[in-house]
């Protein structure tokens, strides 16, 4: 996976935008002041007491139709009477953005929801990506029945190629998500060793003691799903990443009816997306961005238009293509991740491209500016993304012109503001018109949508997921407003073991979790010590001392020679280097006088003496590496 691909998906994973469209409009909340939340009464494993049950009606009326016969047969099996509590164990994704993975365990069955990666912090120098530590799954591999994936963003699928090497079980998800996973596995030469199982919205699969139903939701990528996880201890609903979009660009709106139907069954717990829990109101529909594109294309009819957006936002790409077609423009796509996702989505029918609309990037120069639209990666200022290379004049095929109109169809992710600002400045200096406001909506639910899902599902317990601690606590506050008791709301940390049934729920312990750092082909071979060394080198540089000693007497035969990298420029610091050599010689003479012959101790004496000297002279502490050779 390229750095461009990494940064692209990292930004999607951490999306939490402000602005006109993402903020939405708050609707009045008319619940009576004396309203008290009352979860529906259920017996110990989530079924209505016999005297309360209605006579069964047709399946289409009481629940979603299951498209496969096998699923219908299996999903109708009699629920197992609960003898144990359900364990929910988040192995990542809480108190952070990215690396989403949660284990659901009941007796001898474990089902894992999502398996995502995170991306390195600024101080993780040289690190390619970060994956969750799945030691718990490896220790209980005989129990693991499969991975169930909610959608195809990197923070939910990105760790699969690494984790499946140790925990090789089937992976279940919807059509587009499975296709994106297959692309990743192909890059790792794992297509023949991994079982990928495609499911449909409404289908129920059975994995050990669990039955799992996929529910249609809306998000910034197609085929996103919520999950209804049925266990003998009760039903848990996991929303995945979602928003409520009544007018989606492609496909159906979120299946709120099914959420309500499951809510009437009695839901033990709801695990709900917290990314936008700090924001009031509703998230605006993706379709609203299309009207903005229409206005911009009409305003800049004679200009070449370049639009930067997230690679996986297929609906956004569809609207750009639709607008370009209406205005008689050809569309070119640039950026590896953008090309991969668009190609896959088009092949599967999730992207509809009119004939003779799409052209190769090499053909852009053959058309007048007013007949071209370029869709590119780089909306977050990623240094190696296509737009950044254009801004820096190092792109091989596209040169920015003074009459270009460049649209950022995204908002800067927290932490990316400087990088985005740098690219905008570089583009503006070339005379381009840069538009970066009001051309984006979020893919995550705001407070009123969160309230809606809770009102439909009516869970006994609330478990905010997907977000930093402030996002989780923001959802906790929203849920308290709905009347769910504080003691029934669990803000968990990665590694917590939450045991629950219809009678009680409590955190009973922890499992080992953490981050595994991936550096090139190395997985887990870079730890805190290596990172500390890299940080030290980056901040203060290194000074290498080379000296040759006589084998028996430890008398200096050659040197000391001093090599500096990243500390000082030797030619301009000759006095400092001469002083450093003198300090090393004195330290070696001191060892000889004190009859210190152990090379390890000699290196320590040299290092301490040189470090003290350099600090006094420069107030800096480079890494010092003594090398002793014998002759």
Outline where the language-model segments fall:
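A glycine- and charged-residue-rich anion-binding loop/surface
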Residues: 94, 118-129, 143, 440, ...
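Intrinsically disordered, low-complexity RNA-associated tracts
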Residues: 1-80
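Hard-cation-handling environments
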Residues: 279-409, 413-595, 603
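Short glycine-rich phosphate-binding loop at a beta-alpha junction
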Residues: 170, 463-464, 625-626
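Conserved hydrophobic residues forming the short capping helix/wall of the S-adenosyl-L-methionine
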Residues: 185, 479, 614
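His/Asp/Glu-rich metal-coordinating catalytic cores
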Residues: 56-146, 153-366, 385-399, 418-421
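Conserved beta-strand scaffold positions in the cores of enzyme catalytic domains, especially
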Residues: 88, 196-198, 269-271, 406, ...
